[in-house]
């Protein structure tokens, strides 16, 4: 983060650097679980905030490690938050947020399911305070079933609608738009000119205009990762980060003037 004068009156403006990345519990396209190489990619951008999806805590496949703590250390950011959406291999699995700044509030909202056999999804919310700015951060990983994504988006908008207008909102994550699960580990992806999930969010927030594919796997590929931000901040630039096979997702980087 850097701070500079916003105008001749001396009002200060902050540059906030944000990344969102579905790390697939550290698993690369080669099958190796390696947080180090994922963190190395992110470190090059020196972010202030990192949204992570598909984080493990104390699972066998993660060698019983607390991945959010490990990733936090590897990207040199001292504060982190992770909430479990499901229990898995005697551990936990969910989403995380890593921050350069103290987290003053953290909660996880479990999303509705249309079938109890479907994977439980959640939306992790953190709040940080920078001077007079209150910043609400959301790490999102929506369902691979469209009906559940729409229900979850409606729940997300209910949460956002309760936030004061002068507070800042930044959402990052894997929205799975256009993805349909057709069986165990089988998916289809449909590219559309617009998605109902995005249309609902864009009534209140601004979406990054990223269009490059962010999901690559034997199961399919498409642009399903992005960020949204409130209208009281401005976007300086954004970039899709090639993860170099360290995950089946690319990361998204954005800079905001706050």
Put a short name on every predicted segment.
Residues 26, 53-60:
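Active-site neighborhood of divalent metal-dependent phosphoester/pyrophosphate hydrolases
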Residues 58-61, 89-91:
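Short active-site-adjacent helix-start/loop capping segments
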């Amino acid at each position: 983060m850097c701070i500079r004068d916003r105008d001749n009156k001396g009002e200060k403006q902050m540059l906030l650097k944000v990344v969102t990345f579905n790390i697939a519990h550290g698993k690369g396209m080669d099958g190796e679980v390696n947080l180090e190489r994922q963190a190395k990619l992110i470190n090059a951008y020196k972010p202030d905030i990192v949204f992570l999806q598909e984080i493990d805590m104390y699972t066998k496949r993660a060698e019983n490690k607390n991945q959010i703590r490990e990733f936090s250390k590897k990207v040199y950011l001292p504060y982190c938050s992770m909430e479990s959406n499901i229990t898995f291999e005697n551990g936990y699995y969910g989403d995380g947020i890593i921050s350069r700044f103290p987290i003053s509030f953290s909660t996880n909202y479990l999303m509705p399911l249309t079938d109890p056999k479907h994977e439980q999804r959640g939306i992790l919310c953190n709040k940080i305070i920078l001077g007079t700015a209150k910043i609400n951060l959301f790490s999102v990983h929506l369902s691979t079933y469209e009906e559940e994504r729409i229900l979850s988006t409606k729940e997300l908008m209910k949460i956002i609608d309760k936030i004061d207008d002068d507070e800042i909102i930044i959402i990052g994550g894997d929205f799975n738009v256009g993805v349909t699960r057709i069986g165990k580990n089988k998916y289809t992806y449909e590219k559309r000119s617009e998605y109902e999930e995005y249309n609902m969010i864009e009534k209140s927030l601004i979406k990054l205009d990223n269009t490059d594919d962010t999901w690559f796997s034997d199961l399919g590929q498409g642009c399903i990762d992005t960020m949204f931000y409130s209208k009281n901040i401005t976007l300086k630039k954004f970039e899709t980060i090639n993860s170099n096979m360290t995950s089946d997702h690319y990361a998204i980087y954005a800079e905001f003037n706050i």
